[in-house]
Amino acid sequence: MRPQKLILSAFGPFAEETVIDFTRFKDGIFLISGETGAGKTTIFDGICFALYGEPSGSYRKQDMLRSDFAKDETETKVVFLFSHRKKQYKIERNPSYMRKSKRGDKMTRQSPYAVLYQEDEIVTTGSQQVTAQMEEILGMDRMQYQQISMIAQGEFLKLLYAKGKERSEIFRKIFGTWYLYEFQEKIKRRHLSCKYEYLVRAGR
């Protein structure tokens, strides 16, 4: 998957519509830097939220995504354009949040919603439906995507302080080497089985 453009509106610290054009970075590698609280992690939250309906960190929930600085009339949403296997996709998604009613000053809850486009054609609509479709397109769920594609700022501490066995499991998930581990365990079981069979026959 290659990100092309991310549009954040009233999302996290971004009170107004903010556009990040990834196509400007031609070298393939670029650095996202800034002071604490500037919104670096929010960029990853926006991408992960667009794809799977949840932000990148386990400590942030949908109802925490609306910017505290946004005007009442500003819609909270994320638009993410990307390419995958030579196909162009666009996702528009909004979280559940409290907004001002269109009639009067009462506050009402905006329901989560999403639309997935492929080459300007609607593929599916609905928050859960888009998430399910993205899991099928990318071949991984949100947890697998996070472990392979990004380690959020807070989640990185889990890796630093993980014990030996737990750290090994994290790295297996990150680098996709579970199949090697399972193959190794299969060989061990086969070895023990052959060894037992040999000892039984030798005892006879």
Q: Which ranges hold each PLM region?
A:
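Extended, Lys/Glu-rich alpha-helical coiled-coil stalks
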Residues: 30-31, 49, 122, 136, ...
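Extreme N-terminal "head/tail" segments of very large remodeling/mechanoenzyme assemblies
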Residues: 1-132, 142-144
